[in-house]
Amino acid sequence: ETPQPVRWLLRDTFALGEASLLAAIGGAGKGMTLLDLGLAVAAGPEPGTEWAGQQVLGREVDATGTVVIIAAEDSQASIERRLHSLDADRRIRRRLGGRLIVVPLPNVGGAPCLFATVNGVHGPTPAWTGLGQRLRTIKDLVLVVFEPLAAFCSVPFDTEINAASAVTGAMAQLAADTGACVIVSHHMRK
C-alpha cells in the first residue's frame, strides 16, 4: 500500500501534522523568521494571483490558514515593530482576516509552565492541557509556534532524555490531533 504523501506547510522543511524544532544561537533571527512564516501562511496569496512564489527561508509556502504564535519573550510593542518591518505598507496584514493570532505573553502575565516534573516524572501540566483544548477548537489551524521552548518548561529537556521525550511527545500529539505544523524554537549556546 502506498503511503500518503507529505503535506507541507513550508515545502521540504515543515510538514503539516508534525512537530518541528527551529534551533539557533540567540540573536540569529528565529523569532523574526517564524513571524515571517506566520504572516505568509495566515495571509495566503494576494487576490487574483497564484500561490506559487510565496517564500520563507527560500522555500515555498504550501498551506494557508490560521496561525497561532505564542511569544514568551516579545512584547506587543516588539511584535508590532517586527510586523511593521516585514510589512510596512500593511499590504499583507490587510489580507489576514483574523488568521494571525500572536500572543505576546509579557503583556498578559508571562509564560505559563507547560511542562514540569512532579514526583520525579516529567510531563505536561494542566496549563498545557487547557491550551491544547483551546487550540483544537480552531478549525483551520495550520501552524502553532512556541517561541522559545525553554520559557514554557521547568523540565531539563536539553539534558535529560525522559524530559525531552515528554515535551516532544506532547508537541507531536498536538500536531497529530490538529493537523497543524507545531514549531518550537530553541536557543542554542553560543
Regions found by a protein language model. Give the residues of each.
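Short hydrophobic/aromatic beta-strand immediately N-terminal to the Walker A/P-loop
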Residues: 20-23, 68
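Conserved inter-motif catalytic segment of the P-loop NTP-binding fold
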Residues: 10, 52, 60-157
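Post-Walker A helix-loop "phosphate-sensing" segment adjacent to the P-loop in P-loop NTPases
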Residues: 40-64
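Substrate-engagement module of ASCE P-loop NTPases
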Residues: 130-137, 164-188
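Conserved glycine(s) of the Walker
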Residues: 29-30
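Hydrophobic positions on the alpha1 helix immediately C-terminal to the Walker A/P-loop
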Residues: 33-37
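N-terminal pre-Walker A segment at the start of P-loop NTPase domains
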Residues: 1-9
